[in-house]
Curated annotation (Swiss-Prot):
Belongs to the diacylglycerol/lipid kinase family. YegS lipid kinase subfamily. PROSITE patterns: DAGK. The active site is at E271 (proton acceptor). Binds 1 Mg(2+) ion per subunit. Ca(2+) may be able to substitute. It comes from the Bacteria. GO terms for molecular function: ATP binding; lipid kinase activity; magnesium ion binding. NCBIfam families: lip_kinase_YegS (TIGR03702), PRK13054.1 (NF009602), YegS/Rv2252/BmrU family lipid kinase (TIGR00147). Mg(2+) binds at L215, D218, L220. The keyword Lyase does not apply. GO terms for biological process: phospholipid biosynthetic process. ATP binds at T40, G66, D67, G68, T69, I70, N71, E72, T95. Keywords: ATP-binding, Cytoplasm, Kinase, Lipid biosynthesis, Lipid metabolism, Magnesium, Metal-binding, Nucleotide-binding, Phospholipid biosynthesis, Phospholipid metabolism, Transferase. This is Probable lipid kinase YegS-like.
């Protein structure tokens, strides 16, 4: 019987003291799993550890953290040549863990680590923005972006994903639309947008399904935007139910361009990017990721195999 293929865990510094993670790592090592561990301290560390992982010849690179950590590791993997590229594994340790939750990845560290090293590897899409930045889960613009950026760390630590919603309710007085124009294949819209979601994954902001039809292996991004032609009570209802609403506009596109007369901010898996022009395109089958059989972000082709 062959020994398990080696893996490297890149863990966000905030989770380095997690006792459950330490015990899970030790348990796998006791089962002869070669598992290297590296801890990030500042921006760019994850990318450097990805290069080290290639030198070590690991089969799996595990991102231990929230959506931002997964983003950084996935982006560094996408920049590698396909031949010999490690598979992405995920250990959810963030505040909301939106991508992991939508994939049905276990939140218990030992279960997540076992999936990350032994699970089925499937090709998944990534999205690229302005030919320089990536996202694996979602890009959000408008009011929702300001809320996730401004939610205090102490509130996030105490309440988790629901903190975004609570902070949003407290900041409704600052509700302001972004005027912009959005174009894509057979799609054109211009006007004032309160919330813009461009999903490779389904949910953001602590479990809110902003792009409920998105899949990570269909070669498309789901655009969903909420226009400003809306009264506040109806706006809140529109964000949290599936009822038809003429002010909720959606499309499935392989690429789209957004232009604004003023500077806008988009959150790419929680990391801000400012600008007046954004070109966002899907990269089909960009990397491989170890996912559970019941992953709800995979289309029928993959999930039924």
């Amino acid at each position: 019987m062959h020994p398990p293929a080696p893996a490297l865990l890149i863990i966000n510094g905030k989770g380095a003291g997690n006792e459950e993670v330490r015990l899970a790592v030790q348990k796998l090592r006791d089962e002869n799993q070669t598992l290297h561990v590296r801890v990030t301290w500042e921006q760019g560390d994850a990318a450097r550890y990805v290069q080290e992982a290639c030198q070590l010849g690991v089969a799996t690179l595990i991102a231990g953290g929230g959506d931002g950590t997964i983003n950084e590791v996935a982006a560094a993997l996408a920049a590698l040549p396909a031949k010999g590229r490690p598979v992405l594994g995920i250990l959810p340790l963030g505040t909301a863990n939106d991508f992991a939750m939508a994939c049905n990845i276990p939140l218990i560290p030992e279960q997540a680590l076992r999936l990350a090293v032994k699970g089925r590897a499937v090709p998944i899409d990534l999205a690229k923005v302005n030919d320089q930045r990536y996202f694996i889960n979602m890009a959000t613009g408008g009011f929702g972006t300001r809320i996730t950026t401004e939610t205090p760390e102490k509130l996030k630590a105490a309440l988790g994903g629901v903190s975004y919603f609570i902070h949003g309710l407290l900041r409704m007085d600052t509700l302001k639309a972004d005027r912009c124009e959005i174009r894509g294949p057979d799609f054109h819209w211009s006007g004032d947008a309160l919330v813009i979601g461009i999903g490779n994954g389904k949910q953001a902001g602590g479990g809110q399904q902003l792009c409920p039809d998105a899949l990570i292996n269909d070669g498309l991004l789901q655009l969903r935007l909420l226009t400003a032609d809306e009264l506040l009570p109806t706006l809140i209802a529109s964000l949290f139910n599936d009822e038809e609403n003429k002010n909720v506009i959606g499309a499935a596109l392989p690429w789209l361009e957004i232009d604004a007369p003023h500077e806008m901010t988009f959150n790419l898996d929680g990391e801000p990017l400012k600008g007046r022009h954004f070109r966002i395109e899907v990269l089909p089958n960009a990397i491989e990721c170890r996912l559970p059989p019941n992953c709800e972000l995979l289309g029928q082709t993959q999930s039924s195999q």
